[in-house]
Amino acid sequence: MTKVLLGFMGVGKTTVSKHLSMHCKDMDAIIEAKIGMSIAAFFEQHGEIAFRTIESQVLKDLLFANDNSVIVTGGGVVVLQENRQLLRKNHQHNILLVASFETLYQRLKHDKKSQRPLFLKYSKEAFYEFYQQRMVFYEGLSDLVIRVDHRTPEEVANIIEGY
């Protein structure tokens, strides 16, 4: 069965996936290859709705492949109800990586390499509300929750591989 890594932007899903011995499929990388540009550029040119439509199709394709890999999702994969329904069908294999809001905020604030469109458009207070809304979705879909604040990516990867 395919395992799915879920979590808010900046929590370390992609970083952790690099330490897994299992085959990983990074949705953001797959989408960028498909659209021929960065997700940030696509958001700017086409908007969030167009992006979410593509993201949903990629998720569906990866889940239906059912090839014992790990799907590394983007932070917003839980936004669409259709995606949440797909993820519910993957019951017992959804893994949520969690960090405190302050940890995430600081990571995103200092990440000059990967400027995230949804982070840039909010004040810290509004971003906290956005974070809280998303966490409700993540928590409702997750079968295993791993706190990452005080763990190395290698430690998190070991927990995932043992699950």
UniProtKB/Swiss-Prot annotation:
Its EC number is 2.7.1.71. It is found in: Cytoplasm. It is an enzyme of class 2 (transferase). Its cofactor is Mg(2+). GO terms for cellular component: cytosol. Keywords: Amino-acid biosynthesis, Aromatic amino acid biosynthesis, ATP-binding, Cytoplasm, Kinase, Magnesium, Metal-binding, Nucleotide-binding, Transferase. Pathway: Metabolic intermediate biosynthesis; chorismate biosynthesis; chorismate from D-erythrose 4-phosphate and phosphoenolpyruvate: step 5/7. Mg(2+) binds at residue 14. Its main location: cytoplasm. Binds 1 Mg(2+) ion per subunit. ATP binds at residues 10-15, 116, 151. Substrate binds at residues 28, 52, 75, 134. It comes from the Bacteria. InterPro entries: P-loop_NTPase, Shikimate/glucono_kinase, Shikimate_kinase/TSH1. HAMAP family: Shikimate_kinase. Catalyzes the specific phosphorylation of the 3-hydroxyl group of shikimic acid using ATP as a cosubstrate. Belongs to the shikimate kinase family. This is Shikimate kinase. It comes from Streptococcus pyogenes serotype M12 (strain MGAS2096). The gene is aroK.
